[in-house]
């Protein structure tokens, strides 16, 4: 089993518990926004990520930082959840837990998550057209795009929906041609 699969197995019960708590508190949308904010903060601050993932830093210090950073910024349920993760020494799985949480919520709401890798930022018109195309392909009510800029793709884009990948990038085509030429020679 890959380490990513192992982490996903550990993260899933936490994500399920958070979905259940958020749903019973009628706060799914608020929790979604708060977790997206936290995920964005962690992605932008490598120091904060390293701090939370460092096992040598005591749980009390981590709890104090969570309280000072997020009190009055995010829903109290999110703060309590983060404190539980710190107590159980699972805060290092926060990225995976957030990802699993969002997957579960989107399943509840019949939303498809499409990860889009592109060399440049897509315009609103392009995003809208892509969303409509993905809705048609997946028969879903709504589509959530997670866009990542990857300049190495040169042109085109890669779309990942679940286990399905659609690669229309120039990088992917060149890689395919290279593999073909290596197999022939």
From Swiss-Prot:
Keywords: ATP synthesis, CF(1), Chloroplast, Hydrogen ion transport, Ion transport, Membrane, Plastid, Thylakoid, Transport. It is a peripheral membrane protein. GO terms for cellular component: chloroplast thylakoid membrane; proton-transporting ATP synthase complex. SUPFAM superfamilies: N-terminal domain of the delta subunit of the F1F0-ATP synthase. It is found in: Plastid, Chloroplast thylakoid membrane. InterPro entries: ATP_synth_OSCP/delta_N_sf, ATPase_OSCP/d_CS, ATPase_OSCP/dsu. Its main location: plastid. F(1)F(0) ATP synthase produces ATP from ADP in the presence of a proton or sodium gradient. F-type ATPases consist of two structural domains, F(1) containing the extramembraneous catalytic core and F(0) containing the membrane proton channel, linked together by a central stalk and a peripheral stalk. During catalysis, ATP synthesis in the catalytic domain of F(1) is coupled via a rotary mechanism of the central stalk subunits to proton translocation. F-type ATPases have 2 components, F(1) - the catalytic core - and F(0) - the membrane proton channel. F(1) has five subunits: alpha(3), beta(3), gamma(1), delta(1), epsilon(1). CF(0) has four main subunits: a(1), b(1), b'(1) and c(10-14). The alpha and beta chains form an alternating ring which encloses part of the gamma chain. F(1) is attached to F(0) by a central stalk formed by the gamma and epsilon chains, while a peripheral stalk is formed by the delta, b and b' chains. Belongs to the ATPase delta chain family. This is ATP synthase subunit delta, chloroplastic. It comes from Gracilaria tenuistipitata var. liui.
């Amino acid at each position: 089993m890959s380490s990513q699969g192992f982490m996903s197995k550990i993260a899933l019960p936490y994500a399920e518990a958070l979905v259940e708590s958020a749903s019973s508190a009628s706060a799914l949308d608020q929790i979604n926004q708060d977790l997206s904010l936290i995920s964005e903060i962690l992605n932008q601050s490598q120091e904060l990520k390293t701090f939370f993932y460092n096992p040598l830093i005591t749980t009390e210090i981590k709890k104090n930082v969570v309280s000072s950073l997020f009190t009055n910024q995010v829903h109290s349920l999110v703060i309590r959840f983060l404190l539980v993760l710190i107590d159980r020494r699972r805060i290092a799985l926060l990225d995976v837990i957030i990802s699993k949480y969002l997957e579960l919520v989107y399943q509840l709401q019949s939303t498809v998550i499409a990860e889009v890798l592109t060399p440049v930022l897509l315009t609103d018109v392009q995003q809208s057209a892509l969303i409509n195309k993905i809705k048609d392909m997946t028969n879903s009510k709504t589509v959530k795009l997670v866009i990542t800029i990857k300049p190495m793709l040169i042109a085109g884009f890669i779309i990942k929906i679940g286990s399905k990948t659609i690669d229309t990038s120039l990088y992917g085509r060149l890689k395919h041609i290279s593999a073909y030429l290596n197999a022939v020679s």
